[in-house]
């Protein structure tokens, strides 16, 4: 059995926040696969289904982000699961929008939801060795801007890459059930344009950058560059006259 937990804050006022991208991913998985209706249990909204022959429990903790571990730990104890059975989906400031990374174990990176889960996983065999799916939301640039940034809504310009990312995660979730994490990341990168994507859906190909045309020049400079050098005679009457005219010495 696999438990997929999407992190976020409950309530309509948070629904479109960057911090709620984990909830968004869980909702898209729910929509694209056969799951039971959402029900309230373990201080969460949960739904169960089967993906590629693997029983999957979707969990959206309703405890608010900072207490996510309470809900997830309760569900895992009920189903007698270990951290190896857990995948947590959450927002990552240190990845550009549209990037995705999966890693087993590691630190919290300052994410309060992950801090809470790490604390509750200490009572399980395997501790913090659960899979973490980080979805890039970008960084506002200064530490003091982070709070309002993560609790702010995605801009309309983000919808293109956000919809593509959510769809790719949901469509390829069977790879997570099979523990094919590298193949999953490769598939997402392809869906997002080989991973070379800037915020706002603008794709950048390194090969194209290397072959970029020179900067535009003014028509005067172009004319000067294309102008042929005059053919000045070096000897004869004309050469002598030019020397006198220009004051050129031998």
UniProtKB/Swiss-Prot annotation:
Hydrolyzes ribosome-free peptidyl-tRNAs (with 1 or more amino acids incorporated), which drop off the ribosome during protein synthesis, or as a result of ribosome stalling. Residues 219-229 have a biased composition (Polar residues). GO terms for biological process: protein quality control for misfolded or incompletely synthesized proteins; rescue of stalled ribosome. It comes from Brucella abortus (strain 2308). InterPro entries: Pept_tRNA_hydro (IPR001328), Pept_tRNA_hydro_CS (IPR018171), Pept_tRNA_hydro_sf (IPR036416). This is Peptidyl-tRNA hydrolase. It is found in: Cytoplasm. SUPFAM superfamilies: Peptidyl-tRNA hydrolase-like. Its EC number is 3.1.1.29. One of its GO terms (cellular component) is cytoplasm. Keywords: Cytoplasm, Hydrolase, RNA-binding, tRNA-binding. Its main location: cytoplasm. It holds the Pfam family Pept_tRNA_hydro.
